[in-house]
Amino acid sequence: RFYRPNAGVLYPALYALLDRLAASAKSVRAAPQRPDGGEKGYRCDLTGEAEWLTHDLAHLSIPKGERKHADTLWNRAISKRPGLSRKGEHLGALAMLKRLWPRWFVEHELGKCDIDVRRFVVSTHTLAVSTSLERWLEQGAPIGDAGRELLVKADLAEHDDALDYAALPRRLMRKLMRGKTYDAQQRRLARTLPALMEAASSDDPEADNSNARLVGQLLGDKPETYYALILLDGDSMGAWISGTDPDKLLKTRDTFHPQIRERMKARFTRPEHQAYLDARRAVSPSRHMAISSALNGFALTLAQDIVENRCKGKLIYAGGDDVMALVAVDDLLACLTLLRAAYGGLPVPAPLVTTLKLDLEGLKLGGGHALLDGKLLRLMGEHATASAGAVIAHHSAPLGAVLRTLRAAEKRAKGPGGRDAFAITLLKRGGGATELTLPWRLDAPTLDDSPMQVLAQLTALFAGRDTSRKAAYVTQGWMPHLPAQLGRDALHPLLARNLAYQLARQGTDTAQADDYGHKLATLAVHPRLADTGPADVITHTLAVAEFLARESRSGNTRER
């Protein structure tokens, strides 16, 4: 006999029925309302969703600007324990638990083990400053007069129980604490800088912050104030699991070993045999186990290693095909690239490794697998795609608004980006937003000559000493005036020549300018970006590259 069915043939039907049952249960799930009319008064300063905690309901009607001298629960708490929350901050129950549980854990759990840890949750401010701190450490961490004055202020604040050591990103903490490269004063200074800056901060942007001024003198430049958030999600995961998309299923004949396939050609020649072999293989327990194994390897092992060990970041969540992470702004492109390559097990091209200065020690990606410290991990493979959204924001920007922008960026990558794309939204503190959406791959199945490579190379070009960032501003000025009557094919040489000319005028080598002009023009007119105007592609790419190339992020200085 050619094939004898067994009970396993019922698995696809059973899975489909259970999937429909679970989907229908969601649509009829009850969501009871809060009793007595729900929330009242002003909302939590952090989440903006629930009323803030109080011992007197009348206090809930006091506007934020008038709470300073009111006898609220939070003003009482801050007066007794200054490090409990920020000045004037009034939190709801959930936000309070999130704010206080790290302190409780440190005092009641780590304290039993004689581990001296004040804080282990990385704040957005600390993450932003970590970009400048890493550069300071690479310069040998000189203390100088400014550093000594900051250490004195740290002693005074600690004596008053008004100072917590900052939790630095793991990568930076390892560099700081391992070996004998840095002494006790340098280590203490690095861990107290963010806290000292926050202690002297004010809601008034014009207010003088003496601590921030001293930190600027210590670091040699104004401390970095921007950080990034990443949200990555696998594409069409439902179709991969349910097997409803034929493009994500192999033909039955392709699941056999090549030698067996050759024998089958000679032995099974009847039409019904060929119809069976050409049919798409139905979903099975082994397929679901393979997908589960691949997603576990990515989420539980690779995601944290990439975000926290190879970049200055903090993994917030990793489950299956979903990843959310905080990352220092100078590591944004590197983190995005490594996460995407790790999801599908794609090799990272050498030019990207060099340009982004990727840390691949102990990690090898390729062939749908990863080899991490000698451990082989199965991944989703090159045909599985993932889309990512990223937001660059000021550390003082409302986190709720930043998260909404992050989710919108991820939807933009999956919607207008056409999936297998990344979207970066740049939120400048002065106002306005730049939205860049690019595919991960154009024509090749790998990341070679990818749009990310173009973006990374432009960032490195502007960060160098030869090319002025003025090239980005000048180009953005004439982009809106492109002739609308020209088709994309005719527009390519015009864009390439003009981009090369502008780059050469601002100091780029002629051959290099021609190369970058051609790459950027090719990206702008590519059919994959047909829904986006070429002018918008170039303008937004240059804007993001120029922002990431500024001295506080690139570490390069030039004559002004």
How should each PLM-predicted stretch be described?
Residues R1-R560:
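Regulatory and interdomain segments flanking nucleotide-handling catalytic cores
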